[in-house]
Regions:
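RNA pseudouridine synthases
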Residues: 1-184, 290
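Pseudouridine synthases involved in rRNA/tRNA modification
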Residues: 1-30, 197-200, 205-212, 220, ...
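Short histidine-centered loop motifs in beta-beta connectors
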Residues: 41-43, 210-217
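Short, P/G- and charge-enriched loop/turn segments at secondary-structure junctions
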Residues: 72-73, 187-193, 252-257
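Well-ordered beta-strand positions
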Residues: 77-78, 129, 181, 204-207, ...
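Short beta-strand micro-motifs in enzyme catalytic cores
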Residues: 84, 161, 213-215, 266
Length: 298
């Protein structure tokens, strides 16, 4: 990917990049050692002067190190030069971790990029738990990733999840506000505890059945395991969840053979960080609701 723009006033290139392109100082510092900065077609350093009318270009090519490419089938929902959205299956990590360096979505994406001749990085914008499925968004370079970080901070990304739960909220719509606390001892589990971080989830009931319900969930905050914990703590755990469940929800899930947890990132809406266009990406997957054969959230 290459950014191109025209200088409108005098100044140093570094100031131009930070002011006009909103680049972080760390990214500018990294680019200056990669021969990635050009003014009027000439590779220059960050202290190079720019004048009104100068053509400035920034090459944002990246390489990926630290894990190996793997052949795997990927479901690409959307792609352009700045980002890619994949439909992640359940049971797969988004990115390698210290304990697992293979079999992740990123391993397959590395093969995809190399096969298509793309010099892209792998920067997850949205991550999903191993057993949560649906839309995963990844930036192709650090510049776009930083744009998404700022978009997150300003509330410019809307995520919609579908969840089939055991039980149901009394109200048809509402907000769950419960702090999420990370348990100690190296555990990944979270608990509702006053010592935790503020966490807010909006919900809307889409369908109700005798024992279960289909919910649309909108995480206002993005804490680890937030949706799963909030549903369980509110009395309607997600079906198939191996960690955040009640005895009754686990028994019901086992009775109907529900595995993995029925939580799907069905839709992601945002303003494209490069084009400025309203963008909506939808998963092709759906949660399984045993009391309804075709439950969807459009």
């Amino acid at each position: 990917m290459q950014l191109r723009c025209t200088a409108s006033r005098e100044g140093k290139l570094e100031s131009f990049l930070r002011r006009e392109l909103s680049m972080s100082s760390s990214l500018v510092s990294r680019l200056k050692w990669q021969d990635a900065l050009l003014v009027n077609g000439e590779a220059v350093h960050t202290n190079h002067p720019v004048h009104p009318g100068d053509a400035v270009a920034v090459r944002l090519d990246e390489t990926v190190e630290g894990f190996e490419p793997e052949e795997m089938a990927l479901s690409v929902l959307y792609e352009d030069e700045a980002l890619i959205a994949l439909d992640k299956p359940a049971g797969m990590l988004t990115h390698p971790s210290p304990s697992r360096n293979e079999g992740t979505l990123a391993n397959g994406l590395l093969t995809y990029y190399r096969a298509s001749g793309q010099k892209c990085g792998i920067h997850p914008v949205s991550r999903l738990d191993r057993d949560t499925f649906g839309v995963v968004l990844l930036a192709k370079n650090a510049y776009v990733h930083e744009k998404f970080r700022l978009l997150h901070q300003s509330g410019g990304m809307k995520k919609t999840y579908a969840a089939c739960v055991f039980g149901a909220p009394e109200a048809d719509a509402g907000t769950i506000e419960l702090p999420v606390y990370k348990l100690g001892g190296g555990s990944l589990l979270r608990a509702v505890d006053a010592r935790g971080q503020q966490a807010v989830t909006e919900f809307a009931v889409q369908c109700r059945w005798a024992h279960t319900a289909l919910l649309a969930l909108h995480p206002v905050t993005g804490r680890t395991h937030q949706l799963r914990l909030h549903c369980m703590a509110s009395g309607f755990p997600i079906l198939g969840d191996p960690q955040y469940h009640s005895d009754a929800s686990r028994a019901f899930s086992e009775r109907f053979g529900i595995c993995p947890q029925q939580l799907c990132a069905v839709r992601l809406e945002f303003c494209h960080p490069i084009t400025g266009e309203a963008t909506c990406i939808a998963s092709k997957q759906r949660v399984r609701c045993p009391e309804e054969t075709a439950a969807t959230i459009g």
